[in-house]
Swiss-Prot record:
Monomer. The gene is yjiC. Changing H293A: Strong decrease in activity for both pterostilbene glycosylation and UDP glycosylation. InterPro entries: EryCIII-like_C, Glycosyltransferase_28, UDP_glucos_trans, UDPGT_MGT-like. Activity is improved in the presence of Mn(2+), Mg(2+) and Ca(2+), and inhibited by Ni(2+), Zn(2+) and Cu(2+). This is NDP-glycosyltransferase YjiC. It is an enzyme of class 2 (transferase). NCBIfam families: MGT. Changing S277F: Significantly enhances the UDP glycosylation efficiency, but shows unchanged or reduced pterostilbene glycosylation when supplied with UDP-glucose and ADP-glucose, respectively. Changing M315A: Significant reduction in catalytic efficiency and glycosylation levels. Keywords: Glycosyltransferase, Transferase.
Amino acid sequence: MKKYHISMINIPAYGHVNPTLALVEKLCEKGHRVTYATTEEFAPAVQQAGGEALIYHTSLNIDPKQIREMMEKNDAPLSLLKESLSILPQLEELYKDDQPDLIIYDFVALAGKLFAEKLNVPVIKLCSSYAQNESFQLGNEDMLKKIREAEAEFKAYLEQEKLPAVSFEQLAVPEALNIVFMPKSFQIQHETFDDRFCFVGPSLGERKEKESLLIDKDDRPLMLISLGTAFNAWPEFYKMCIKAFRDSSWQVIMSVGKTIDPESLEDIPANFTIRQSVPQLEVLEKADLFISHGGMNSTMEAMNAGVPLVVIPQMYEQELTANRVDELGLGVYLPKEEVTVSSLQEAVQAVSSDQELLSRVKNMQKDVKEAGGAERAAAEIEAFMKKSAVPQ
C-alpha cells in the first residue's frame, strides 16, 4: 500500500476533534503521514495520536459560557461562515510547500472543503454528527431562517471584500466518501443513505490523558451526570441533581465543567463524587445510567458501553439525538425547561426499571461494536485513495 500525506482539517471543539484522534492513530500506524490543522489547545492530543499539529488562529471561542451565549443568540451560522474565510489563507500558508495527497474535513469545517477545491485534491468528509444527503438535512425552521439571514449578511460582506461566494449549502453536499461516527441503525432516515456513506460507529481508541477512576465501584448502581464540554455552565442543574439523588441508592459521579468550582456546590452528599472533569470512557465502563446533554460523542460512548440514557439537550442537534434515543427506546428525553428535582427522579426510575429498554440498549451496543470504528474508517480511506489512483 502506498503511503500518503493526509491533511485533516477541523474546527476547535472537543465534540469534533475527539472522534478523529483514534483515526489519526490508525492512519499513522499504517505508515501514512497525517498533518492536522487545529488550534493550540488541541495540538497535544493530535501529537499524542501520532499526527503533526499545524496551528491556525481563530476567533471561535470554545468557552462554555460564550458558546451558550452564541447558541442563544443564534450567532453560530455567521460565526462559522466568517471563520472559514479567516482560516483559508492560513491553510494556504501552512501547506504552501507541502501539499497533501488527500484532505479529510469535518462536516462543519467549511475551510477544509474550500481548501480541497482550491488544491484540486481528493476529499473525504467526516461526520461527527448525523450525515446529510438529498433526503435528510440538519436544521429546523428557526435554524434555517437564521442561516438564510446569516448568508444574506455574509454575501454582502463577500462582495464588499471581493471574495468568492461561500454558502452553508456546500456543507450539506455529500462527498464521494463520507465517514460517519455512528452505526447506521442510529442515523435518522438511515434507509435513504447509499454506499457513499460509511457508518463506522464511534472512533474511540484509548484516551491518552486517561486518569484513574475517581471512586471504587461498590454494590450500588453507578450514575454518571455530565453536560459535556461546551454546554455545562448551568449550576442550577447540578444543584437539582444533588437534591434529587442525595442519600439515594445511587452512587453518583458528576462532571460540572471548567467554569464551575465543585466546592461552590455546598453540602455535597456522601454518595456523590463531583469534579470539573472525569475520565468518561472509564466511568461508563462501570456505569448503570448516564444523565447527558445528548452530544453525539457522549451518546455513542454510552451505547458502546451499553449504558441507557436520560437526555437533557442543550441545543438543536442534541434535541434530535434526544428524540432519536426516545424513538429507538434507548432512554428518556427530558426537555431542559422541564427539569426539576422530581422529573429527574422520575426519569431515572423509568429508565433503570425498564428491562426491555435495557435489552434494546444492548442490541445497539452490538451494532456499535460491529460497525468497525477507527480500523474500518482507516481501511475505507485507503481503499478510496487506491481507487482515486493518487500518485505516491
